[in-house]
Amino acid sequence: MNQDIDTKIESKIHEDLSPTRNLTGLHLKIVAAIAIIWSLFQLWYASPFPFWFNIGMFKGLPARAIHLGFALLLAFLIFPFSKSKKISIVDILISIIGTFCCLYIYFFYDQLVDRGGILLKINISENFILPIELIIGICGILILLEATRRVIGKPLVIIAVCFLLFSYFGQYAPEMISHGGLSLKRLVGFQWFDQEAIFGIPIGVSVDFIFLFVLFGALLETAGGGKYFLDLAFAMVGK
């Protein structure tokens, strides 16, 4: 009896201290479905099938954008804004917007390349021009920072914000590290629509290698492979 009570107390403490939501029911099924689709995409991208069938081939930047889109979608569904464990409409909305900002790169990649870094503007009327890609880039950067805060914590967000401010206000930095400063358009264009910033080498390595290692490691652990190798090691040393 006391053991059952202790187990329930430990479970409650873990639930309260865990940064993630305890998903159940429909929410759990949705998150699981997204994770499965993400895994299938990564397996397809890493396989030779796209080249064999000449279909579903992804270039570097679009593949990285899709990868980050899945990550943002799951981040806001799994990690809550506060101690509340329920998924709010705001979390769902932010996750959809963040995913859209990433998928925009995939759907309009050729146009982005043709414009050579010039962000698209839409003429709404004679007196109003909507900087659509500037807005998408700003939203994507802000949502990524919020996702980073939820998953990892504030320190990395603070470092990223400091470098963004340094890029924009570089002319006010000490002379040894000062530079001309980037305009908001150039900053957003480089950070969000280029393959050298947010979608640079780290995400490239994640797309090509890290995700697959984590996926197959999780499958191996679930299938009992971890216990098998431990038992094998103990058997080899005679314990």
Where does each model-flagged region fall?
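Perimembrane helix-loop junctions in membrane proteins
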Residues: 46-49, 53, 109-112, 116, ...
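C-terminal ends of transmembrane helices
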Residues: 75-85, 144-149, 222-227
